[in-house]
């Protein structure tokens, strides 16, 4: 089976985290992840969504790609609100939480978060969560 990508666009509001978690869980189940891996995937998805949501975007786009048992979730935050940027201390805490849930997390800063790349800590499963703002 080849790459299958689903693109979902959500308003950057907490109510939509549940819908994104369910979509990620469905794709994870289809890709053959076990229940613990799906739970971890849902947690990473929530944290990445929260991180971008609170940065001041109006919408968050999530691309979920399944390719023969591996998953990749890419997030893009679009249409920033002016003047609604969180304090750096809150950003540091959120980034630390996301990093603690993953094997590797690289952050690039330029006033706001430019990119967060994290590889899931699931042993044999190849799961990546990417958060980036464009």
Regions found by a protein language model. Name each.
Residues 48:
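Hydrophobic residues in the alpha-helical elements that line and stabilize the ATP-binding pocket
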């Amino acid at each position: 089976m080849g790459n299958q990508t689903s693109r979902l666009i959500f308003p950057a509001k907490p109510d939509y985290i549940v819908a994104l978690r369910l979509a990620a869980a469905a794709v994870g189940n289809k890709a053959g992840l076990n229940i613990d891996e799906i739970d971890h995937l849902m947690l990473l998805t929530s944290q990445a969504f929260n991180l971008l949501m609170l940065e001041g975007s109006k919408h968050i786009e999530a691309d979920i790609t399944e390719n023969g048992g591996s998953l990749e979730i890419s997030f893009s935050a679009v249409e920033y609100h002016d003047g609604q940027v969180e304090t750096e201390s809150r950003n540091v805490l959120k980034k630390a939480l996301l990093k603690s849930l993953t094997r590797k997390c690289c952050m690039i800063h330029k006033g706001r978060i430019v990119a967060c790349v994290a590889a899931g800590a699931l042993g044999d499963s190849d799961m990546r969560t990417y958060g980036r703002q464009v």
